[in-house]
Structures are given as structure tokens and as C-alpha cells.
From Swiss-Prot:
GO molecular function, one term: antioxidant activity
Compartment(s) where it occurs, according to its Swiss-Prot or TrEMBL record: Cell membrane
Keyword Transmembrane carried by entry: yes
Keywords: Cell membrane, Membrane, Transmembrane, Transmembrane helix
Any one of the GO BP annotations: cytochrome complex assembly
Membrane topology: Multi-pass membrane protein
InterPro entries in the record: AhpC/TSA (IPR000866), Cyt_c_assmbl_TM_dom (IPR003834), Thioredoxin-like_sf (IPR036249), Thioredoxin_10 (IPR041017), Thioredoxin_domain (IPR013766), Thioredoxin_ResA/DsbE_sf (IPR050553)
Record gene name: dipZ
Phylogenetic lineage: Bacteria, Bacillati, Actinomycetota, Actinomycetes, Mycobacteriales
Domain Thioredoxin: residue ranges: 394-542
Protein name as annotated: Protein DipZ
Regions crossing the membrane: 123-143, 179-199, 205-225, 254-274, 285-305, 325-345
Principal subcellular localisation of the protein: membrane
A GO cellular-component term linked to this record: plasma membrane
Length: 695
């Protein structure tokens, strides 16, 4: 309340200087105080000068000030930042004074949040660095390390010893320079590439093509020494100490970083969305830097391995010329393969065995809030929270949000836009994807199969292409990528992330299933559970047209290449933390009665009876409360607190455990081997369950 008065006082003080009457005398913290001048009704009397510049009143604050009316752009008022927004329409002036709440978190909490982001980013990058998506660049990285062993190191010295040491140091540092260049260019291009190209009015794939040309030039320079001399000639006028030697490797790393396309995940999605929407803050920069660093460490290992092999194996030392030719050839081959998108076929063929690890480090509520993976809540999308990820039955999650800010369409008559309202009466599947996303490339064959099988039965599919990288904003690239994947259904180009944000999306890929009345009935983030999605599609088609004849399910003929986790991910019961709830009804805070669904998806759980849910866990609120769990593990542990008994039913055999005291871990299954099974847990009234973990 005190802070609100301070903000209002600060706003009123500035308003009185400009002769403006406050629009309201009091506002709550949720609704900031606003002072405005309608167009043409008055001028600001505190006008200082025209032309933008630094405020000469240094005692206030060194911030930009408005050259049209002299308003100071920022003024701190208690816990608020008072921002002045000035617009000029024709010859009339409209000024607005707005008090905006500042970050309410204490300094220690803000530091902790940044450190958490750094840890999450590093772990996410490290997991990405051991994923199949790095395979295309591994040969170049390996040979870049092997090539770092200069032939001069094995020749007899003819000059000064100091020269040999300097050359040896340069060769030793080459792997680090290659990886350093990769980290720098990957981070900069991911965050700033799209904005920079837009400012310069260049094609969105200009950076990619420039990197491909640079990669070919570097490869040719390694093969042909005379060509390398031509490349170095522009630097000949630079003082000798500053010339980049041919064993530097930093330029090679810069080119590789631009072309490096890691597997999509929640952390990379947060970075890409922040860069594309120009919402870059300290947290985004920290997340990007630590993600790039984590992803680079495994690559550095391969580069150092190549260097060590070259040092230890005599054949490498004696054949440095051949090593240079091999490195150049592999570099050029990689560039040619990237032009024709050949590495994607290899990446699709090898399942991403790290996907479940990516999900586990980014599913916590606090982490998801910091990554801003949930998008912006508005009147159109607020009810999407009623849908749980990958539920095995239909849910009701509000009217489907609009397809906003679409910059173009493909695969429609005349490339004209489609309005969702025009599709009422049909079942609609909205599929978020990106053509270079390996996860999407494994999922799209199923979407294509559904479209081909059910388009004559009333199914409409719209692929919303939201780019991960700047070159994916080029319509021609998207069209080519769609053709390679066999996509013939309409594609909406969401280059500005407007529809992505309006749907509060989190992942590539993501599916939103909409019934014939325009209501969202199912949401699935990521790969997998294709049989569940197709079953729900068929159910909605039957609801829309009772008696319609449907073909055989396509999921029986399309192989599921989704990587399977070795164990079921940790199961949380807290509202906001739950990610694998497969039961009926909304999983919201408060007391409610639940029932088991007819079928339960793998690696999910459902509730029965009355439960009281909060942001910590789920409390048994009746004598019939129970949990059904489908899991894949050898051992199962439950974290539970309170006083009572826990009855565990496995294979029809009940076993009772006494529970007493604060929350702690209890083992409920001790298996002999890894298996997929169903378990029922019946906690007595008053026990609070927090999570399941697996071993």
C-alpha cells in the first residue's frame, strides 16, 4: 500500500509539472495509476528541447528522454517504474504517464533465479551435446583437432626455439578456438540473428548461406595452400602479431556455430522464442550462454580426442598434409550435405535418446515460469489450462484461440488465409512444427497419415510453422521442407510467434485437437502417444458425423520412432508441477472427486475418489481415494507424509504400509527386472502424496 502511494505521488508530481490532471486518484497494485492527455487537448509544459538525447538533468537519472515533449523516459517511484510513452499522430500530440510494477522479488531471490537458469541451461546444453543431432558436425570437429598438430612440430628446428613454442601453442589452442567460435556464433545467431537481418533488410537465410560459403572457403583453403594465401591476403596489412594464423580455427568455429542445429527442447525453445520476439533480458542471455557452453563441452572432447590421436599416432604426425586435405574435404562435404538437408535423414533415423532427460530438467513449476514456456494468458486461451498434456481421453479446454499474426500461407487455394470459424463442423488438428526440427520430422509422418486417412471423413489439419531459426522464416525454405516431408495440408507461417504465444505453446512439435464446435479437446506436447491421438480423432469424427465409416487406424502402419525413456519420468502431484496426469477432469487447486478413465496411457497416473489438491501435492480426502499408476521401472518409490496407512495393490495382491511423521520416501515396488506394469495405491484419509520416483 505504501509503495502504491509512492507511485501515485510520483505520477502526480510529474503530472502537475505538465499541467495534466490525473485520470484516477487511487489504483491498486494490480492496476497501475495512469495519467493521460488526449490528442489535441494540451501540451506538456515541461518541454525542454527537440531531438532525442541524454537528459541534461543528470541528478534525476541517466536515461533516454523524449525529444517531442521532453518527458523523462524512466523515473523510479518506490517499487514502481514510471514510464512515459509519447506518440505523435499527424500534428497532434498524445502523452501518457503509466506506473508499472517493478520486479517484486528480493535481490537474493533474483540472484538465485539467475543461478538456477544458469544450471538448467548448462544441463540442457550438455544433454543436447550428447544427442544424435550433433552427428553431422562430429567429423569436422574431430579432424579440426587432428589438423592442429602442425608439421613443424615434428620437423627439425631451423629457427629460434621461441618460434617453435609459439607455433606449438597455437596448435594446442586450436580445438578450444574452434569450439569458442562455435559457442559465440551459435549464441549470437540464436538470440540476435533474426532481428539483425530484419534491421538490415536482408533475407532471413542470409546468415546461413554466408556460413555455408565460409565453410566451403575454409575447406578449400585447407586443401589448396595457394587459395588459403588468397584468403589471408586481406589481413596482410595488419601488424604481424595480430594476424590470425592458418591453424587458428576460430573462423571454422564461427561458421559451424551458424549451421549447428541442435535437437529442439524446452530450453532451446525458450531461447529461440525470446530472440524471435525481442524479449531478451539477463535471464535469457545467461540461459543462452550456459546452454551453448554445455552443448560445446562434448564437442570439445571430440576435438581434443582428435588432437591427442594425432599427437600419439606417428602416421598422423608424418602425414599432416593428408590430414589437412581430409579435414578440408570433410568440411566441404558437410557444407554440400547441409545445402541439400541430408544430415536430417540421419538424425531422423536415430531416435533422440536424450529427449526424456530434457523434459525432466525443465518440468518444475519455478523453472517453467522462468523459461516462460507457458506463454501469455489472455481471454482467448485461459481455459487451455483445463487440458493436461497427452491425456488419454477427451477434455474440454475452451474455444480454440485465433490464428493470430500469420505472415503467409502455403497449400491453400491462392495461398489465401484460413479462418478457424470457417472450419466449424469439421474436426481440426493444429500441429506446431518447424521443418528443421528433428523431433517434428519424426512426428509429421503420423500427422500426414491421419490427414490422408481422414480428410474425406471430416478432418482438417493446419500446420502452424513457427521457426526455430532465422532461415526457417523464408517461405521457400518452408515449402521445400514441407514437400520433403510429404505435407499437403495447409501451412500457416507464424514467423512472429503470435499464434505460438496465443496458444501458450511450449514445444516443437505440439498438437491441439479441436472438435466440430470449435472447442479444444486434447493437447499433446512433444513426440509419442500417436495411437492415443488417433483414437481421439476417430472419436471426434464419430461425434461430428454419427455413423461415418472410418478406415483402419494409420498408426498400425506408421512406425513410432519416438525415443523411449529407460524409466518413467518422476511423477509430481502438485498443481502446476503435474505433467503426466492421465485421468478425467481438471487437475486444479481445491477439493474434487475423481474417477479412473477407461484406459490409462503409459507413464501416467489417474485419481479416484475425493482429493484435495494444492501446489505441494495431493491429500486423500475420503476413504475411497486411490491412485492408479502405469509405469516402466524396476523399483517404485513414493514420497508421502501424515499419519495413516498406505495400501499398495500389485498383481491383485494388497500390501499395507504404516505411515507416520513428516513427508519421506517409501519403496512400494521392489522388482527383479525392468518392466511395464500397473500399480494402485490407496492412502488412508489425511495422507498427503507428493511424488513417485523410479529406479
Amino acid at each position: 500500500m505504501v509503495e502504491s502511494r509512492r507511485a501515485a505521488a510520483a505520477a502526480s508530481a510529474y503530472a502537475s509539472r505538465c499541467g495534466i490532471a490525473p485520470a484516477t486518484s487511487q489504483r491498486s497494485l494490480a492496476t497501475p495509476p495512469t495519467i493521460s492527455v488526449p490528442s489535441g487537448e494540451g501540451r506538456c509544459r515541461c518541454h525542454v528541447a527537440r531531438g532525442a538525447g541524454r537528459d541534461p538533468r543528470r541528478r534525476l537519472r541517466r536515461r533516454r528522454w523524449c525529444g517531442r515533449c521532453g518527458y523523462h523516459s524512466h523515473l523510479t517511484g518506490g517499487e514502481f517504474d514510471v514510464n512515459r510513452l509519447c506518440q505523435q499522430r499527424s500534428r497532434e500530440r498524445s502523452c501518457q504517464l503509466v506506473a508499472v510494477p517493478a520486479d517484486p522479488r528480493p535481490k537474493r531471490q533474483r540472484i538465485t533465479d539467475v543461478l538456477t537458469l544458469a544450471l538448467v541451461g548448462f544441463l540442457g546444453g550438455l544433454i543436447t551435446g550428447i544427442s544424435p543431432c550433433i552427428l553431422p558436425v562430429l567429423p569436422v570437429i574431430f579432424f579440426s583437432g587432428a589438423q592442429s598438430v602442425d608439421a613443424a612440430q615434428v620437423a627439425k628446428p631451423e629457427g629460434a626455439v621461441a618460434v617453435r613454442r609459439k607455433r606449438a601453442l597455437s596448435a594446442t589452442l586450436r580445438p578450444y578456438r574452434v569450439i569458442g567460435g562455435l559457442v559465440l556464433s551459435f549464441g549470437m545467431v540464436t538470440l540476435l540473428g533474426s532481428a539483425l537481418l530484419s534491421v538490415l533488410h536482408l533475407p532471413q537465410d542470409a546468415i546461413r548461406w554466408a556460413a555455408l560459403v565460409a565453410l566451403v572457403a575454409i575447406g578449400a583453403g585447407l586443401i589448396f595452400p595457394r587459395f588459403e594465401q588468397l584468403l589471408e591476403k586481406p589481413f596482410s596489412r595488419i601488424p604481424q602479431k595480430q594476424i590470425v594464423t592458418r591453424s587458428n580455427g576460430f573462423g571454422l568455429g564461427l561458421a559451424l556455430g551458424v549451421l549447428y542445429v541442435p535437437c529442439a527442447g524446452p530450453i532451446l525453445a525458450a531461447i529461440v522464442v525470446a530472440g524471435a520476439t525481442a524479449t531478451i533480458g539477463l535471464g535469457t542471455v545467461v540461459l543462452t550462454a550456459t546452454f551453448a557452453l554445455g552443448a560445446a563441452l562434448p564437442l570439445l572432447f571430440f576435438a581434443l580426442a582428435g588432437q591427442r590421436i594425432a599427437e600419439r599416432v606417428g602416421a598422423f604426425r608424418r602425414r599432416q598434409r593428408e590430414i589437412r586435405i581430409a579435414t578440408g574435404s570433410v568440411t566441404i562435404l558437410l557444407a554440400v550435405a547441409l545445402v541439400f538437408d541430408l544430415p536430417a535423414a540421419l538424425q531422423r533415423a536415430i531416435p533422440d535418446y536424450t529427449a526424456s532427460l530434457q523434459q525432466q530438467i525443465s518440468t518444475g513449476t519455478e523453472i517453467r515460469e522462468q523459461l516462460n514456456l507457458g506463454g501469455i494468458v489472455n481471454a482467448q486461451n485461459a481455459q487451455l489450462s483445463n487440458c493436461s498434456d497427452g491425456a488419454a481421453q477427451l477434455e474440454s479446454c475452451g474455444t480454440a484461440p485465433d490464428l493470430k499474426g500469420i505472415t503467409g500461407w502455403l497449400n491453400t487455394p491462392g495461398n489465401k488465409p484460413i479462418d478457424l470459424k470457417s472450419l466449424r463442423g469439421k474436426v481440426v488438428l493444429i500441429d506446431f512444427w518447424a521443418y528443421s526440427c528433428i523431433n517434428c520430422q519424426r512426428a509429421i509422418p503420423h500427422v500426414v497419415g491421419w490427414y490422408q486417412a481422414y480428410k474425406d471423413s471430416g478432418l482438417a489439419v493446419i500446420g502452424v510453422h513457427t521457426p526455430e531459426y532465422a532461415f526457417e522464416k523464408v517461405p521457400g525454405n518452408v515449402a521445400k521442407g514441407a514437400a520433403n516431408l510429404g505435407i499437403s495440408y495447409p501451412i500457416a507461417l507464424d514467423n512472429n510467434y503470435a499464434t505460438w504465444t496465443n496458444y501458450r505453446n511450449r514445444y516443437w512439435p505440439a498438437e491441439y485437437l479441436i472438435d466440430a464446435t470449435g472447442t479444444v479437446r486434447h493437447i499433446k506436447f512433444g513426440e509419442g502417444d500417436y495411437n492415443v491421438t488417433e483414437t481421439l480423432v476417430r472419436q471426434l469424427l464419430n461425434d461430428a458425423k454419427p455413423g461415418v465409416k472410418l478406415p483402419q487406424p494409420s498408426s498400425t502402419t506408421t512406425p513410432d520412432l519416438t525415443p523411449r525413456a529407460a524409466l518413467t519420468p518422476e511423477t509430481y502431484f502438485g498443481v502446476g508441477k503435474v505433467v503426466n496426469y492421465g485421468g478425467g477432469g481438471a487437475y486444479d487447486e481445491g477439493s474434487a472427486v475423481f474417477d479412473y478413465p477407461p484406459s490409462l496411457a503409459a507413464n501416467s497416473f489417474a485419481l479416484r475418489g475425493r482429493w484435495a489438491l494444492d501446489y505441494q501435492g495431493a491429500t486423500s480426502d475420503g476413504n475411497d481415494a486411490a491412485i492408479k499408476l502405469n509405469y516402466h521401472a524396476k523399483d517404485v518409490y513414493i514420497v508421502v507424509g501424515g499419519t495413516g496407512t498406505l495400501t499398495v495393490v500389485r498383481d491383485g495382491k494388497p500390501a499395507t504400509l504404516p505411515i507416520s511423521g513428516p513427508p519421506t520416501t517409501h519403496q512400494v515396488v521392489a522388482g527383479y527386472r525392468l518392466a511395464s506394469e500397473t500399480l494402485e495405491v490407496r492412502p488412508s484419509k489425511g495422507l498427503q502424496v507428493f511424488s513417485f520416483t523410479y529406479g
